[in-house]
Amino acid sequence: AVSDLQYLLTFAIMAGVGTSFNLVNGNLRYQAQKHSTLHQQIRQLYEFSRKLSEALVYQQVFDALDEFFPRLFKAKYALLTPSLAEELTVNHNQLGERLDLTIARWVFDKGQPAGLNTNTFAASQVYYVALNSQLRTRGVLALIPESPLDFFLPSEQELLNNFIANIATTLERIHFTQIAIQTEVLLAKKID
């Protein structure tokens, strides 16, 4: 009876140690995978920023968005930017009929997110976020994530905010560059 109790105690201790090692190993594997994913995302965001820094016209921004958005996010998207008359123009639309221009206009005017996972237009399955630059809103990005639970994690939202800030800053830079060119052309015409 004593030896059976001794075997049972030894087995329980070994099972506890084995379970502990398994949990620690699983946690380390998970952390390593998250670190690798984060490293890849940072590298992609850096490449995206570099490509945007070279952009001289809006189409180059749209092309960079088409190239890098699928690499960083598991979501379909639509990009809307204002015309000179402040009308929102759809530049790229993977959302089809689910894109609501009324909600997009509200987001553009207010500069705040709306739709999915917000308190504004919460019934919508689309998440609308403003492309806010230093001076004003430069457009709206509408998204339908494959997995809303993963998409709205703080780390994913931080990545999205950095991504959006890069787009907004680039759109603003291009806008002011175009205004400067137009002004220069007008001044040249007045001199002649």
Where are these regions (language model features)?
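Membrane-proximal extracytoplasmic alpha-helices
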Residues: Y7, F11, Q40-Q41, F68
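Alpha-helical transmembrane segments and their interfaces in multipass membrane proteins
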Residues: A1-A15
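Conserved, well-folded catalytic cores of nucleic-acid-processing
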Residues: G18, Q31, L38, L72, ...
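Membrane-embedded alpha-helical core segments of multi-pass
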Residues: I13-F21, Q40-R43, F73, R136
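Membrane-proximal helical linkers
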Residues: L23-A64, I179, E184-A188
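Histidine-centered phosphotransfer motif of kinases
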Residues: D192
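Signal-transmission/dimerization alpha-helices at domain junctions
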Residues: M14-N27, L159-Q182
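GAF sensory domains
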Residues: E47-R173
